[in-house]
From Swiss-Prot:
InterPro entries according to UniProt: Anticodon_Met (IPR041872), Met-tRNA-synth_bsu_C (IPR004495), Met-tRNA_ligase_1 (IPR023458), Met-tRNA_synth (IPR014758), Methionyl/Leucyl_tRNA_Synth (IPR015413), MetRS_core (IPR033911), MetRS_Zn (IPR029038), NA-bd_OB-fold (IPR012340)
Residue stretches making up the tRNA-binding domain: 558-658
Entry's localization field: Cytoplasm
Gene that encodes the chain: metG
Binding of ATP, residues: 325
Cofactor note: Binds 1 zinc ion per subunit.
Native species: Archaeoglobus fulgidus (strain ATCC 49558 / DSM 4304 / JCM 9628 / NBRC 100126 / VC-16)
Protein name listed in UniProt: Methionine--tRNA ligase
PANTHER family for the chain: METHIONINE--TRNA LIGASE, METHIONINE--TRNA LIGASE, CYTOPLASMIC
Similarity annotation: Belongs to the class-I aminoacyl-tRNA synthetase family. MetG type 1 subfamily.
Gene3D superfamilies: HUPs, Isoleucyl-tRNA Synthetase, Domain 1, Methionyl-tRNA synthetase, Zn-domain, Nucleic acid-binding proteins
Length: 658
């Protein structure tokens, strides 16, 4: 048996294409497993706790539950529309989930893995409240980037413990926060160092997840697992504390399995206690730390079975730009895609087939149109419709004796390619395999010329059509996990029931194939539809209708305090273990300065060396990823990328900007 889970969507906002990189491949994987004869339980649910939900609810004048209800129903609707079929889709604010979370936390306490500790926490004197997680913003203590309370999302990506953030400010009122002491509870993560190193050496899954985790496990610290909130799972014996959301959210995999097994008639304990199943987590790359470090340590401490594999998708870009909801670089699943009337199968195919699962996916409406029209329609759809329509018109039913052995061998090869691809989590390779078979089918049909044979040799025409029908049957079966809605329609034309079909049925030859009039499998993606969607996106990129935030006015004296100069980059090199940071040695006239800048994703060291830049020279020194920075280079932003400010003409380094 296999248990397949998906990272829980956060019930705090709408579904976008970035979400689908987890859910569509997982659904495709589960469908292929079942068609291979595997017994599978497939679960997911809404993540309903945590400070972002509480903050958002406060800002909208809603209770956390009211906000969660809205987005929980939204995700159910989206998954249904895209034919993502979980055995059970739950929510973490349910009683059954609270029960399982409390049971596991109590077990960790009883076994001595949880202890209390007085810590310094950000406190807002104006709001008169402690500021957990997203209630506080400030500076990352490790790299100096802007950070939220529990995560350095703009810099090094580290998880931040309560009280670590520097220069904290209240997210609600903007006031400067102070630190006050309070008792919280910690999980002894450091006791699991040896276990985690051994576990990660054996864990299966995608290399992007495993490599990240193996680097992080070397510097473990105990983990604060309580928060000052009213919304969440109450921590045992502490009426004013709840369990941290990253403790209770993954426990949803267990509580949702319990509910799924109630409905399916299986025993959840065999999966999570006895370890009689493979547990496979599909997640986004941004939550690898939680799933490969925190989660297995908790499970080990509470005597639960461990995940067998962690499958992490690459990130998502939109029209080549870094995904950002705030900047408009986003495609919303419902309002952009579904409401345009496009088939859910097209989006499923694009998500799976655009690139390798571990690589970054770029969502482009132009590329989307080309892939659908040139691959799905012109290759797969063309073959299926031509063959099925010809067979129906000229035969009605076809005796299948004499199917070409070469055709059967091609079908078997395709099945093996798909199965091999699934073992490597390469869903693109699986979909490429059936597209290659469709290309072969088009050539075979064209070379056989049954429309000519039927005039002179009806038996030869029948054999040719039988071979093409076998290919059509195989393609319907192989493509079904990726494009279920369309393949169900095509299956009706050959009387094929896909409900209990097996991959091996693709090369089983029936005595007779009875045909009905086939539907056109796919509708062309029209230029007008794409142009309309592109205009919507361009408008969003420009932020039309949104006013730029106005900063507080300053005096000329304030401006004159800034020492802004022209500098020349003498040397540039990337900061180790950082994707964004680059270390620069800059000549600013009277000295050479070392400055760290977050432009490594937009400029190479070679592009920067010799370049004139604008430098803020009297900025207080700071450390980024342990590297000292004494100043700042100035840049604008265009399409989500940094654009350096440079003088129009050649200017000597050290020249002041005034």
């Amino acid at each position: 048996m296999k248990l397949v889970t998906c990272g829980l969507p956060y019930a705090n906002g709408k579904a976008h294409v970035g979400h689908l990189r987890t859910y569509v491949p997982a659904d495709v994987y589960v469908r292929y497993l079942r068609m291979s004869g595997e017994e599978v339980v497939f679960v997911c649910g809404s993540d309903c706790h945590g400070t972002p939900i509480v903050v958002n609810a406060e800002q909208q004048g809603l209770s956390p539950k009211e906000l969660v209800d809205i987005y929980h129903e939204h995700f159910i609707k989206i998954f249904d529309a895209l034919n993502i079929k979980f055995d059970f889709y739950g929510r973490t604010d349910s009683d059954y989930h609270h029960h399982r979370t409390t049971e596991i936390v109590k077990r960790l306490i009883e076994k001595g893995y949880v202890y209390p500790k007085e810590i310094q926490l950000a406190y807002c004197p104006k709001c008169q409240r402690f500021l957990p997680d997203r209630y506080v913003e400030g500076i990352c203590p490790y790299c100096g980037a802007l950070a939220r309370g529990d995560e350095c999302d703009q810099g090094c990506g580290r998880h931040l413990e309560p009280g670590e953030i520097k220069e904290p400010r209240c997210k609600i009122c903007g006031s400067k926060a102070e630190f006050r002491s309070q008792r919280h509870y910690f999980f002894k993560l450091t006791e699991f160092q040896d276990f985690l190193e051994d576990y990660l050496s054996k864990l299966k899954g995608t290399e992007n997840a495993l490599n990240y985790a193996r680097n992080w496990v070397k510097n473990l610290r105990d983990w604060c697992i309580t928060r000052n909130l009213e919304w969440g799972v109450r921590f045992p014996g502490e009426p004013n504390l709840v369990v941290y959301v990253w403790v209770d959210a993954p426990i949803g995999y267990i509580s949702f399995t319990e509910k799924a097994c109630e409905e399916k008639g299986c025993d959840w304990r065999k999966i999570w206690i006895d370890g009689d199943a493979e547990i496979i987590h599909f997640i986004g790359l941004d939550i690898v730390y939680h799933h490969c470090i925190f989660w297995p340590a908790m499970l080990k401490g509470a005597d639960y079975a461990l995940p067998s594999a962690v499958v992490a998708s690459g990130m998502v870009k939109v029209e080549g730009k870094t995904f950002s909801k705030s900047r408009g670089y986003v495609v919303w699943v419902e309002e952009d895609y579904l409401k345009s009337g496009l088939s859910p199968d097209y989006l499923r195919y694009y998500i799976v087939n655009y690139t390798s699962h571990q690589k970054d996916l770029n969502f482009s409406w132009e590329v989307f149109r080309e892939k659908v029209n040139n691959e799905v329609i012109a290759t797969l759809g063309n073959f299926l419709y031509r063959v099925l329509l010809f067979a129906w018109k000229n035969f009605g039913e076809v005796r299948m004796e004499g199917v070409d052995e070469e055709v059967l061998e091609k079908i078997r090869e395709t099945e093996q390619k798909i199965l091999s691809a699934l073992e490597e989590w390469e869903f693109k390779a699986a979909s490429d395999a059936f597209m290659e078979l469709a290309t072969y089918g088009n050539v075979y049909f064209q070379n056989a010329k049954p429309w000519e044979l039927i005039k002179t040799d009806k038996e030869a025409a029948r054999r040719a059509v039988a071979s093409c029908l076998q290919l059509a049957k195989a393609l319907i079966i192989f493509a079904y996990p990726v494009m279920p809605e369309s393949m169900e329609r095509m299956a009706k034309a050959i009387g094929l029931d896909l409900e209990n079909v097996r991959l091996s049925d693709a090369y089983k030859v029936d005595e007779v194939m009875k045909l009905s009039k086939p539907e056109v499998p796919f509708a062309k993606v029209e230029d007008e539809v794409i142009e309309k969607l592109q205009k919507v996106m361009e408008k969003r990129f420009r932020g039309e209708g949104e006013k730029m935030e106005q900063k507080e006015e300053i005096s000329i004296e304030d401006f004159q305090k800034l020492d802004i100069r022209i500098g020349r980059v003498l040397k540039a090199e990337k900061v180790k273990k950082s994707k964004k940071l680059i270390k620069l040695i800059i000549d600013i006239g009277d000295e050479q300065r070392q400055i760290v800048s977050g432009i490594a994703e937009d400029y190479t060291p070679e592009e920067l060396e010799g370049k004139l830049v604008v430098v803020l020279a009297n900025l207080k020194p700071a450390k980024f990823m342990g590297v000292e920075s004494r100043g700042m280079i100035l840049a604008a932003e265009k399409d989500g990328k940094a654009v350096l400010l440079t003088p129009e003409k050649e200017v000597e380094p050290g020249t002041r900007v005034c």
